[in-house]
């Protein structure tokens, strides 16, 4: 009977660890930022930078290598203006998404190797339209009627 119990505990610990890790969403924003501020940090980059250095700023908040990230090479004000286009349905079914009127320069960064503090990324430069989710601004956000809070899709 004892060997069966001994085999159970490591599995139980592994299950509990898995549940604990599942509670931390990869896209969770830092507590000190509004959703719009986190969007700007993660997805708005008016002047293109190499992915390895650009992702370092994002990864430092999370303390791990983010798998994939897209940077829009537009000023925040231009992305916020997209929030004034007609509403469309987001991937999650919510109706607060908006599509850009035109394609923009963007960079997609995909993790290829490394562990936190030494993350290596492959970059892909494209000109595409994008879809963002927008919400009313919170305290500390720029004063626009709606502000972008999530990059939903590149189209």
Curated annotation (Swiss-Prot):
<dbReference type="GO" id="GO:0050829">
    <property type="term" value="P:defense response to Gram-negative bacterium"/>
</dbReference>
<keyword id="KW-0964">Secreted</keyword>
<keyword id="KW-0255">Endonuclease</keyword>
<keyword id="KW-0378">Hydrolase</keyword>
<keyword id="KW-1015">Disulfide bond</keyword>
<dbReference type="GO" id="GO:0045087">
    <property type="term" value="P:innate immune response"/>
</dbReference>
<feature type="active site" description="Proton donor">
    <location>
        <position position="150"/>
    </location>
</feature>
<dbReference type="GO" id="GO:0005615">
    <property type="term" value="C:extracellular space"/>
</dbReference>
<dbReference type="InterPro" id="IPR023412">
    <property type="entry name" value="RNaseA_domain"/>
</dbReference>
<dbReference type="GO" id="GO:0003676">
    <property type="term" value="F:nucleic acid binding"/>
</dbReference>
<protein>
    <recommendedName>
        <fullName>Ribonuclease 8</fullName>
        <ecNumber>3.1.27.-</ecNumber>
    </recommendedName>
</protein>
<dbReference type="InterPro" id="IPR023411">
    <property type="entry name" value="RNaseA_AS"/>
</dbReference>
<dbReference type="Pfam" id="PF00074">
    <property type="entry name" value="RnaseA"/>
</dbReference>
<feature type="disulfide bond">
    <location>
        <begin position="83"/>
        <end position="134"/>
    </location>
</feature>
<keyword id="KW-0732">Signal</keyword>
<dbReference type="GO" id="GO:0050832">
    <property type="term" value="P:defense response to fungus"/>
</dbReference>
<dbReference type="InterPro" id="IPR001427">
    <property type="entry name" value="RNaseA"/>
</dbReference>
<feature type="binding site">
    <location>
        <begin position="66"/>
        <end position="70"/>
    </location>
    <ligand>
        <name>substrate</name>
    </ligand>
</feature>
<feature type="binding site">
    <location>
        <position position="91"/>
    </location>
    <ligand>
        <name>substrate</name>
    </ligand>
</feature>
<comment type="function">
    <text>Has a low ribonuclease activity.</text>
</comment>
<dbReference type="GO" id="GO:0050830">
    <property type="term" value="P:defense response to Gram-positive bacterium"/>
</dbReference>
<dbReference type="GO" id="GO:0004540">
    <property type="term" value="F:RNA nuclease activity"/>
</dbReference>
<feature type="signal peptide">
    <location>
        <begin position="1"/>
        <end position="28"/>
    </location>
</feature>
<keyword id="KW-0540">Nuclease</keyword>
<dbReference type="InterPro" id="IPR036816">
    <property type="entry name" value="RNaseA-like_dom_sf"/>
</dbReference>
<feature type="disulfide bond">
    <location>
        <begin position="65"/>
        <end position="119"/>
    </location>
</feature>
<feature type="site" description="Ancestral active site">
    <location>
        <position position="43"/>
    </location>
</feature>
<comment type="similarity">
    <text>Belongs to the pancreatic ribonuclease family.</text>
</comment>
<dbReference type="GO" id="GO:0004519">
    <property type="term" value="F:endonuclease activity"/>
</dbReference>
<feature type="disulfide bond">
    <location>
        <begin position="90"/>
        <end position="97"/>
    </location>
</feature>
